Amino acid sequence: MQLNSTEISDLIKQRIQQFDVVSEARNEGTIVAVSDGIIRINGLADVMQGEMIELPGGCFAIALNLERDSVGAVVMGPYANLAEGDKVRTTGRILEVPVGRGLLGRVVNTLGEPIDGKGPIDNDGFSPVEVIAPGVIERKSVSQPIQTGYKAVDAMIPIGRGQRELIIGDRQTGKTAMAIDAIINQKESGIKCVYVAIGQKASTIANVVRKLEEHGALANTIVVVASASEAAALQYLAPYSGCSMGEYFRDRGEDSLIVYDDLSKQAVAYRQISLLLKRPPGREAYPGDVFYLHSRLLERASRVNVNYVEKFTKGAVTGQTGSLTALPIIETQAGDVSAFVPTNVISITDGQIFLETDLFNSGLRPAVNPGISVSRVGGAAQTKIIKKLSGGIRTALAQYRELAAFSQFASDLDDATRAQLEHGERVTELMKQKQYAPMSVAAQSVSIFAAEKGYLKGVALNEIGRFEASLLSYMNSQHTDLMNTINATGDYNADIEGELKAGMDKFIETQTW
């Protein structure tokens, strides 16, 4: 049988058309070393920095070191079943986590998988873990307050929506308690919260989740967990996962709050990974890019303008700004704020709340040191009534500390100095507050008004707590409209001042504390 060239050509074309194969861009490699959660792979020619690599058994690794003849990757989970010679392949994807309202009220791991036993999550999509922070033009200045519910913080170190405020202190000084109370205080405000637990004991995290549930704040909160028993890679990535979940609300014109508890442990996890990858160590054995580790995370917390939200939602949301407020926590060793990681994070954030062991042990809780605590941008966002009333609080406390130190050596004090000392003592006592009892704007205003206008003068130091509780109970029952007005508007004018004064005078007459 003879075929001419035309028939051969037609036959080849026909065969090509009939040929069916699932074409898949694959780039396979071989594991050449496995140790401490780090794998070294040969043969991956086209792998990207940060790309997910599929391992045997459905597990994944992330490519972090791209070298001339091999790739260093960190395993996202258990690595006991991996062995030299196993085949791996690239995926062409970077790590993404589920985002959306379906995550509210849930406890998830770094990868966004539920670990609370409440079934699958109904997410609205996925978002990359690493996202470039909004640019300068896309931002709006901080001008709205976020109430923590703590008098000491809202009066002296106010926090605005879109701000980064560091909570720093030694272990067991109330850092987590302050952050949890700030989350509990948002349950009526509409602000969505994310709590990221890094390198903590599972029992501690379970206690935090239980407290949030007891106080009705869990329904408004996403809890991201990378406990101490989990791989260093998951502890390193957990803050970025939580940030992506918080950004979902920011980008849609809503306000969100994220707590990183704590970034010291994330830095330690990253140091562990870097040393295992044979990266050159620097100060305190941290790698050279540990500053960038935190700066690229915290710069994502911002207040974005109307145009950004409109562009992101393709016109679905108009006239709304969005914000992501960050409360990173750093644990210091013996009060050393000049160590490497604390100084890095202090320089990145917009202020810090310094909690001191000595103050905590002396019974002053929250143990805020007003001398070195500062909020660099929150003043513009402070509620009007708190701003007007709290001007003298910080000054009174600063003068009191100075005079208290001086009075130890001076036997005879003049009347003015003694009056300043007594006022400072009373303000210090008034700043004390119980855990899980955040205060409304109106309640804070009443307490600060009492201190500023001299209503505490005749009250014994050990009765100030009882005096405050009775005063607030009286104002809530007898001046409900005033309290509701202050909570709703935050305004301060002659009428409000007059009504507050009249209420205080009547309460003092009753002597019911």
Curated annotation (Swiss-Prot):
Pfam families: ATP-synt_ab, ATP-synt_ab_C, ATP-synt_ab_N. It is an enzyme of class 7 (translocase). Its EC number is 7.1.2.2. It catalyses: ATP + H2O + 4 H(+)(in) = ADP + phosphate + 5 H(+)(out). It is found in: Cell inner membrane. The keyword ATP-binding applies. It is a peripheral membrane protein. InterPro entries: ATP_synth_asu-like_sf, ATP_synth_asu_C, ATP_synth_asu_C_sf, ATP_synth_F1_a_nt-bd_dom, ATP_synth_F1_asu, ATPase_a/bsu_AS, ATPase_F1/V1/A1_a/bsu_N, ATPase_F1/V1/A1_a/bsu_N_sf. One of its GO terms (molecular function) is proton-transporting ATP synthase activity, rotational mechanism. Keywords: ATP synthesis, ATP-binding, Cell inner membrane, Cell membrane, CF(1), Hydrogen ion transport, Ion transport, Membrane, Nucleotide-binding, Translocase, Transport. One of its GO terms (cellular component) is plasma membrane. ATP binds at residues 169-176. It comes from the Bacteria. The record marks 373 as: Required for activity. Its main location: membrane. SUPFAM superfamilies: C-terminal domain of alpha and beta subunits of F1 ATP synthase (SSF47917), N-terminal domain of alpha and beta subunits of F1 ATP synthase (SSF50615), P-loop containing nucleoside triphosphate hydrolases (SSF52540). F-type ATPases have 2 components, CF(1) - the catalytic core - and CF(0) - the membrane proton channel. CF(1) has five subunits: alpha(3), beta(3), gamma(1), delta(1), epsilon(1). CF(0) has three main subunits: a(1), b(2) and c(9-12). The alpha and beta chains form an alternating ring which encloses part of the gamma chain. CF(1) is attached to CF(0) by a central stalk formed by the gamma and epsilon chains, while a peripheral stalk is formed by the delta and b chains. Belongs to the ATPase alpha/beta chains family. Produces ATP from ADP in the presence of a proton gradient across the membrane. The alpha chain is a regulatory subunit. This is ATP synthase subunit alpha 2. It comes from Shewanella frigidimarina (strain NCIMB 400). The gene is atpA2.
